[in-house]
């Protein structure tokens, strides 16, 4: 808030003030008010009529100040009164603004004794104002007090002074001294100020240095942090590159190993194929199928009515020149297409055996002749059936001799085990067609024995000394008519009993009654071990399946056996199959199933043996025997046969 202003009308205000306080001036009052629209104080009016005249000049719309001199009769000097007039119509805001101006106006007009606040004429009462002025100043009415006052006035002495004449020298010294101290004080202040500035500068420099050091340290930390980050990133990149390189190396090694494995597999496959092709090529060189030899032997055995005594067996190793090992090797398209179907033989360990041509006792042609005459081409050995066991079992297994008027083989009922073989044995018609008086050439070579690789399909063992024939007093077992002598029985015989119905000439030996088949010479299906699984197994199974399909396809064709054999098969009653170790019925029927040679070398086992079928018009399936002779027979189809060892007589 702005204060009251005296500068605008200062001279006028002071002049009117001097007129009021002057003893010689007739003016005893002055009236002041504000200039329009401002707080500057100015003189409004003045006069000599006292309070009564002054009270007539106040206005109710303004704020005004009246300065008046009042003379009291009891007082020697006049008193001064300041009247603060605030009209009733003045706004409140203006009243508040001017309330603070009263003290400054009283200070400007020096000597004011009483300040009277008035808003109407009634508030300006001369008697009341005089009373206020006379409080404490009236003359004491007590005479004692009056005498005391007079006595004090009489005893009053003049007042002394301390004024002295001014000495310039002293004054100069004093002034100089004061100036010196003032100068010293100023210099001290300047020095302190400079020290403060220096301290401030030092503090500022320290702060700047500290901030610079902190900045450098921060930059160093950031640099180390960046370097650490770069090292970590570089290490991470190296680790990733190493991992990628290791992954590529592993993939490369895996690819190399995979390629090597594939190359090994391809080489193994090519080697297997080459072995298969070599075996197939060697097998394909055979001019005839050895299976025909077995069929011919079965024809001879079925045609012969004489039995061979079991006691005439010779000891020694078993000679098997007709073992068919071609089927034990892997089959091929050339062998299956160039040779007729063959009965599958069991697989025996595929390793090469030494040349066995020296073990053959005779050539194939001589062998065929001897077989027709009742001479066994290969004797039994402990590998197939022990001789002692055969001799001990023979008396127990003998059956009563049948009457001489027993039915012929053409009408004899054959048991299912024998009929299932269906060997192409010659019947009575075939026998009649042969010239009875023709003597076979002592050493002819049959057409089927020609070829350099026939010996590769046969295995023989050197025979030992033949055992003596049984005594004549011993009862000769009579073979049931109509049942063909098994091929193994022909091998075990010593040639003493010639075949009765054979068309070939027989040696001059007494024909004994036929003997029943020995139970000990048969092999049961339960006694056969499972052949080892080797390389030749898979191909052998495939060959077996192919041959079975061909046999089923040719089942409806006429069988090459004789009519008598067929009639005996068709008319014979059903007889349960005789397994190994069983005895045939003693009523003159077949005592034991005719045992084909190839059955000993067949592939079938207990789980693979076909169930016996009912007799029907179609040709029955051949019987497969599980247990081969206990001899070391190997797959040696690929073994070349020397030219000088082609004949069977090299071993004699």
From Swiss-Prot:
Q: Where is the composition biased (Basic and acidic residues)?
A: 211-236, 288-298
Enumerate the InterPro entries for this protein. ADF-H, ADF-H/Gelsolin-like_dom_sf
Location comes to: Cytoplasm; Cell projection, Dendrite; Cytoplasm, Cell cortex; Cell junction
One Pfam family it belongs to: Cofilin_ADF
Kindly indicate where the leader peptide sits in this chain. none
**Biological process GO terms, please?**
neuron projection morphogenesis; positive regulation of axon extension; positive regulation of dendritic spine morphogenesis; postsynaptic actin cytoskeleton organization; regulation of actin filament polymerization
Question: Keyword annotations for this protein?
Answer: Acetylation, Actin-binding, Cell junction, Cell projection, Cytoplasm, Developmental protein, Differentiation, Neurogenesis
Q: Where is this region: Disordered?
A: 211-350, 371-652
Reported function:
Actin cytoskeleton-organizing protein that plays a role in the formation of cell projections. Plays a role in dendritic spine morphogenesis and organization, including the localization of the dopamine receptor DRD1 to the dendritic spines. Involved in synaptic plasticity.
What is the protein's name according to its record? Answer: Drebrin
State the organism of origin: Gallus gallus
Gene encoding the protein: DBN1
